[in-house]
Structure formats: C-alpha cells, structure tokens
Regions:
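Gram-negative bacterial Sec-dependent N-terminal signal peptides
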Residues: 2-21
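Outer membrane beta-barrel
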Residues: 105-312, 389-426, 431-449
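Acidic-residue sensor for enzyme active/binding pockets
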Residues: 36, 63, 71, 219, ...
Length: 522
C-alpha cells in the first residue's frame, strides 16, 4: 500500500476529531504522533522489502550467468575434442563427432557423403572400347568412297569414350559434375566433357548451366551407356549437332512428373570450339514428352521438340557464316564420312538461321522395346531458297533376363540391368538383348543430277544414306556389357552434270561392317 493511501485511511478513521464529542487537545496531539510513528514504521518496512527483492533478483542473475558461462566453456571444450555437448534432464552428455559415410546404391556404386548428407562426392566414369572392320565394299563409281582413288574404309580399334570425373551434391540443393574425356571419334587427349552446376531446390525440377549432355531428341536424352546400338542413329546425330549435341554449353531447366517431361535451354558452343572465332553458335531448344501409359512394366511414350539456331558461326575474320552437315555410317572406326553437304553458306549467301523439328515415340512391354523419331531440318540462306532435309529412324529390341524402363528425369529410357548377373560357375548368363534398326538420312535438296549444276543455284548434294543394323547386347552386370553390330550401308550420291560431262558421275557405296564394343561404366 502506498504512503498517501495510508495517510488517507488514517484521516478517515479519525474524522470524529472535528465532532462535538472530540477529545481534548492534548489527547488529539498524542493520537497524531502515534499515527505518524505508524506511518514511518510502515514506510521502513516497504523500503526493507524493496531492498530484499532487489538483492534476490541480483543473486538469481549472478547464478544464471555463472551457469551459462560454465555450459559455454563445456561446449567449447567438447567441440575442440571433436564432439558435441548437450544437456539432457540436467545432465551433461558428450555426443561423439559425426564422420563422413559411404553410401552404396542398389547397383553397388558408392558415394562419399557428409554426416548430414548435405555434401556428397562420387567417382564416375565410362570406357567404351570399340573394334571392327568393313566388308564387301562395293563402290558405284571409280572416284568415290570405297574406291582406290577415294580411299578404302579400314578397320581397327578405337577408344570411343574414356571419361573419368566426379559428381555430387552441395548444400543439399545444388548438384555438380566435372568429367574429362580422353576418347573420341579418334583417340585424343583429355578434354572437358562435363562441367556443370545445377539447382534442385524445386520439386522434380533442375535449373542447370555449364557444359553437359543435352536432351533435345529422345536418343540423345538417353545416356551413351544406354544406347541400343554401338552408335546412335545418323538422323538423331545430325539433328542434335547444330546446337544440342553432347556436350555443349547451355543454361536452362527441366521439370517432370511420372507422366510428363518438359525442358527448355539456351545453348552455345562445344568445349573444343576455337576461341578465335568471331561468331559462335547460339541457339535454343525445347522438348516436351508425355507418357500415354506408364505402369512400370508397360509404357507408351510420345514427344515433340523444336530447336532454333539464331547465331550461326564462322571460322574467323572474313569467313562465311555456315554449317556443314556430315556423318559416318553409324560406326566410328574409320573417319571417312559418306554424307556430306559441304558448306551450306558462303560470303555472298551466308546461313542466317536453322530450325529443327522432331517427333518421337517409344513403347515398352516387358522385354519388348521400340523407339522411332522423325526430323525435319530447315537451313535459311540469304539470297537462296531454304534447304530442307528429312531424316528418321526406327528401332526395336527384345531382352531376355532384363528390360528397359522409363526414366522420368530425362524423359527417356534406361539401359538394361540384368536380373541375374553373369556367373558361369552358377550357370547365370546375365541378360541378352536382340535389336534391329533402320535409319534414313537424305541430305539432297533441290537437286537433279541430270540437269546442269549452273541451272540449279539452290541445290544441296549431300547424298542419301540408309543403314540396316542388327545388334546383340550381352549384359554381364550393372557395369559391364558387350555390344555386337552388323551394319549394311547403302549410300547414294551423284556428281551433277556439267557442260563437259553429260552423264552424272556415281559416287555411291554399298558396304557391310562388323563391330563390337566392350563397355565399363561406373
């Protein structure tokens, strides 16, 4: 109670002093003195109480500060020792330090992970060792490929791919890859194959940039480890070589669910593109796919894609902006190209842009698998009509002891993982896949070999190539396999008629090839 309130209460209780019955003045003086003493006593009690409360609060604060200082010192000592100190039910407990761990996948591939799984690093690699030869070379002329003058195709061996690197995750939501390749169409020195960073913080979505394999067409979206034949088809290679091949600088995103995939990317040059060029390739592509059926054991897949090159490269100062479309007969043992348009642009008539359109389909029913794609390529040339090329392929396979399945994050199909790995002591043979493919690539446009070349200013004479391929793939386990291919190539091409030569000169070739590959991947 406050002092003012006490005085008011005492005055009220003594209000009778002013009444006719009031006491004598001496008695009243004594009563007032007694009340003043009571007030002073009560004030002293209040001050004593305030002083005691403040002291108690200060004591509690000192005790808390001392306890927190002791706990901090204990935690720091535990951290210096590599552990963590926690307090459970008033008792101290030291948790041992968390060490990195090794995580093993279902296919026995291992990853080194931090204790909290926020950081991972895993070795990755593939070795594709090819061997083969060419049989029954039947040229249609005397100067084209397969002739003494044009050069016979020769067999041999080739390390098609020898890639080694690391992949992993950083800070939970980022991925990274750094892979070098010492292989190639011919044996080569090591070069960058993949150097990329991705962000995966959004559900079923990756935002990525760097050098990496692109997803423009269905066959390119599948890893080279998972291709049905030793080489991808000529049509898909021609279509993706403009601005979406493997690997290529790109930035973009892809998103997916079990029944659809969509991606869009801005792309540029390959890792080995010369930096001296005054103009480089710059383009973009997008691809969308849909699973009409997807049950795990059965699937039906369709998709479309479009690519546009809007910045066409040249080869240096004062050179034409141009592309050349060329390709070998689906085997990389001999470097001879059959299909070859030559430069599609000149200084007077440069290539201004290129469009590629694609339709894709695939289906899997147990061990049965089929896939097909169609491509249309339009090359825009200043001062000339557009050059248009149609290409496509279809392939089918049947697997015993395994099957191909749909992979949602690439909108493509995986390779075969044998149900029972190869083990001759137990009589296990792994998995066997029997395959067939037909591909057609026609790089001839606005051309009639019976008409004078001068009368055909817009013609392109790259030839027409049809390949018939049979394949056998023998999967030992999840990381080792053999591939064997027989290819019959039918290549047609004529030199145009000239004023001096009235009859077109045939440059075609029919050739058979046998090839194999031993493949290791991890």
């Amino acid at each position: 109670m406050k002092t003012g309130s006490l005085i008011a209460a005492l005055l009220v209780s003594t209000a009778w002093v002013g009444s006719p019955l009031a006491a004598e003045p001496a008695d009243m003086s004594r009563q007032i003195q007694a009340m003043e003493k009571q007030i002073r006593d009560m004030q002293k009690q209040l001050e004593d109480m305030k002083t005691g409360t403040q002291g108690a609060m200060e004591a509690v604060a000192r005790e808390k500060a001392a306890r927190e200082a002791a706990e901090k010192a204990a935690r720091e000592a535990a951290l210096e020792a590599g552990g963590t100190l926690v307090f459970d039910a008033g008792k101290q407990k030291v948790i041992p330090p968390a060490n990195p761990k090794i995580v093993q996948s279902g296919t026995n591939r291992f990853t080194l992970s931090s204790a909290d799984n926020a950081w991972t690093i895993a070795p990755t690699g593939r070795i594709h060792f090819d061997f083969g030869g060419y049989l029954n070379q039947n040229p249609e002329g005397t100067t084209g490929p397969g002739t003494v003058a044009g050069g016979k195709l020769t067999g041999g061996v080739n390390v098609r791919r020898a890639r080694f690197g690391v992949t992993g995750r950083a800070l939970n939501d980022f991925t990274y890859s750094l892979i070098l390749d010492a292989g190639g169409a011919t044996d080569a020195t090591a070069a960058i194959n993949t150097a990329s960073i991705g962000y995966t913080g959004l559900r079923n979505t990756i935002l990525e940039m760097g050098y990496f394999a692109n997803f423009f067409v269905l066959e390119e979206a599948s890893s080279s480890n998972d291709s049905l034949f030793i080489e991808r088809s000529t049509p898909s290679t021609l279509a993706s070589n403009f601005n979406a091949g493997d690997p290529r600088a790109a930035v973009g995103f892809r998103t997916w669910e079990p029944n659809y995939w969509f991606g869009a990317y801005l792309t540029s040059s390959t890792p080995n593109t010369a930096h001296a060029l005054t103009k480089r390739t710059l383009g973009a592509y997008s691809r969308a796919t849909y699973q009409i059926i997807e049950t795990g054991l059965q699937s039906v897949h369709v998709g479309i894609a479009a690519s546009h090159v809007f910045d066409v490269p040249n080869s240096g100062v004062g050179t034409a902006r141009s592309f050349t479309m060329s390709e070998r007969p689906e085997l990389r043992i001999d470097p001879t190209v059959l299909l070859n348009t030559g430069p599609l642009g000149t200084l007077a008539n440069p290539v201004t842009s290129v469009q590629i359109y694609n339709a894709e389909s695939a289906a899997a029913f147990g061990g049965l698998f089929a896939q097909a794609e169609y491509f249309r390529t339009v090359v825009n040339r200043r001062g000339k009509t557009d050059a248009t090329f149609d290409t496509g392929y279809g392939q089918i396979s049947y697997t015993i002891g395994g099957r191909r399945t749909y992979t949602a994050n690439c909108g493509c199909y995986s390779g075969v993982n044998p149900v029972t790995p190869f083990n001759p002591l137990k009589g296990d043979v792994g998995a066997l896949e029997f395959a067939a493919r037909v591909s057609v690539a026609n790089l001839t446009d606005q051309f009639d070999p019976t008409v004078l070349a001068a009368a055909q200013p817009n013609f392109v004479n790259g030839g027409k190539q049809t390949n018939y391929t049979l394949g056998l793939n023998w999967y030992w386990n999840s990381i080792m396999l053999w591939k064997f291919n027989y290819i019959h190539t039918d290549f047609d091409r004529f030199n145009p008629r000239t004023a001096a030569i009235a009859t077109p000169i045939p440059l075609g070739l029919k050739v058979d090839s046998l090839s194999g590959r031993f493949q290791v991947m991890f």
